[in-house]
Amino acid sequence: EGVLTSTSVKDIKKYESLINTNFSDNHLLIIGLNDVLSGNEIKIYNSLALFNNNLDLIDIYYKNNLVPFGEFLPFKNFLSNFGLKNITNNYYSFSKGNERKVINLNDKKFNLSFLPLICYEIIYSGRLKKNNNFDIIINISEDGWFGNSIGPHQHFTHSIFRAIEEGKPILRSANNGISALIDHNGRIVKKLDIRNSGSFSFENLRYIKEKTFFSKYGNNIFFFLIVIYI
């Protein structure tokens, strides 16, 4: 989900000179890459990693919701007998992360907590984080899957609704998609359209500290309305 293709946490240091030239110790970097863990079996995770400008790893999040047939092959032992295989990661399946975590930064330079979401994890309504104890949602994505279809636009639209539901701003970085800053009311503050490269800066983002009505009750609201209607 990032610009450094086929790069893992272990070999990220080869970009140290490039990063040091363009960033200072006042910067942190969020990079989408693969993390490979070796043990009894090799596990590969679609990851969002947070680094300082020396490319020292600060924290990492493993994607929880994987794309069937894209990132993993369901019923692999059975379906592989028919020649089916997933289409990414050199035909290896990604492993599933098991924690929807908040990344917290709390020092003299950086005081921020954010909820990392990778790719289409942003489309899930009411499943983001039970405690809602974060300042901003950061979503990275590779939308090249969709080509010239309506897909990247639909994917982006989901981000707007998540911002409204949670009362949190969303910072979205999407290769071959729409990158944007969305405020806690779902308004698009800044935007880079498809196939446009660039950057934008921001400060003093507002967000709702308390849980919103939706983040308290989630999609149970709609079941309640259905019961009333019946």
Show the residue positions of the predicted features.
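Enzyme catalytic cores with a strong preference for nitrogen-chemistry domains
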Residues: 1-230
